[in-house]
A protein has these predicted regions:
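Helix-boundary and loop/linker segments of multi-pass membrane transporters
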Residues: 4, 74-78, 108-116, 145-146
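Transmembrane helix-loop-helix hairpins at the membrane interface
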Residues: 19, 98, 102, 112-248
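Transmembrane alpha-helical segments of multi-pass membrane proteins
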Residues: 41-52, 81, 115-126
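Membrane-helix interface/capping segments
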Residues: 67-73, 103-110
Length: 248
């Protein structure tokens, strides 16, 4: 048997590794709805990220002496109530995703059907990763340390929003506030239900709604210059800017 101090130290170490993996999600083309379709190497990279996250989650759960009572790493004592709250959260998330898509892009951009399997993987895998780490481990540790509930909720949401921003490269204030709201709602649901099931269900639905409304890859501004045809002057040259590239 591992001595308890060493066991807890290992728990903190593996939790830190999982946090670092979340920060490095962009390198694996994972954890964001706007990743490109790609060849098998890209898919292998994405799957390795989700697989590593699941493995770390299992190790963390095994190492902590009281993962259920202290970290709420369980579905919920009342699963029916948790499921109802999760679906309600998801419904609000769907509405929010459509509003956000119109606000940011001016229109809804539905992805091609061939991208749906990746969208499902993104939604379910990332929601589990985030809820386990941020609403389970991190939020639970903040409560164990004696922080008031409101301060623990705000701190966990702030750290979560910063981690998502670092891991996806998004820089907009609107998206940052969006992740903050997701973090706050998830933590509140954990307090209400005693588990992460409601937060996971609602988060997964919300992320899939993001994929459905903003699922086509974001691209940086690209400058393309066509060969000039004789006698055409500059007619053959054109620039495609950020506003000229549509999602869809």
């Amino acid at each position: 048997l591992i001595p308890e101090p060493l066991q807890y130290l290992l728990f903190v170490g593996f939790a830190a590794l999982m946090f670092l993996l979340r920060l490095d999600a962009r390198r694996f083309s994972a954890a964001e709805w706007d990743t490109e379709d790609g060849e098998w190497r890209i898919w292998l990279s994405r799957l390795s990220w989700y697989g590593a996250g699941l493995a770390l989650a299992l190790i963390i759960f095994a190492l902590h002496p009281s993962p259920v009572s202290e970290l709420n790493l369980t579905l919920a004592p009342d699963r029916g109530f948790a499921m109802a709250l999760g679906l309600l959260y998801g419904a609000a998330g769907v509405v929010g995703a459509f509003v956000l898509a119109v606000f940011l892009n001016g229109r809804i951009s539905f992805p091609s059907p061939g991208r749906y399997p990746g969208g499902v993987l993104f939604a379910v895998g990332t929601a589990f990763f985030d809820e386990f780490l941020f609403r389970g481990v991190l939020f639970g540790l903040l409560l164990v340390l004696g922080l008031p509930e409101w301060l623990a909720i705000g701190s966990a949401a702030f750290i979560y929003a910063g981690a998502v921003r670092a891991g996806t490269g998004s820089r907009g204030l609107v998206l940052l506030l969006n992740w903050m709201i997701i973090g706050v709602i998830g933590s509140v649901l954990v307090l209400m239900t005693g588990g992460i099931a409601a937060a996971f269900v609602g988060h997964a639905i919300t992320r899939f709604a993001f994929f459905m409304t903003m699922g086509t890859p974001r691209r940086a501004a690209v400058e393309q210059v066509q060969p000039r045809s004789r006698g055409s002057g500059d007619a053959g040259a054109y620039v495609i800017g950020r506003r000229d590239i549509r999602r869809g």
